[in-house]
Amino acid sequence: MRFDTKIAVVLRDDLAAWQKANVTAFLVSGIAGTVPGLVGEPYRDASGNEYLPMFVQPVLVYQADAPALRRAYGRALGRDVSMAIYTADLFETGHDEANRAAVAGVASDELDLVGIAFRAERRIVDKVVDGLRFHA
């Protein structure tokens, strides 16, 4: 199945494995919570157990060094793409209110980005992530 949109996550390539998993989970939660119809129906196994629904389309995960991540962030902003961000400061906080305060206290050009995630039309996503490699 081909979708008109793509979901992309861009992670800074110098993160520890646990940080990559944590950042990805937090970033995609922002997308899931704001796009109606993006989450499908619950899953059920043959034994009758029910599981939570997931995205109806794939999530593409890219890696980038800090300058390339900043470039992708700028491209997304320049195209008015709504995105979730995760900054290094958020590793030191423990809840949503503190996370939002940490972001609010820093100008956009000074955010220490470690990851971004967004959903947009295919061609726009392709332009934002141009030159990036899939996460290995």
Q: What role is predicted for each listed range?
A:
Residues 1-136:
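Positively charged, small/polar-rich N-terminal and surface patches that mediate targeting and assembly
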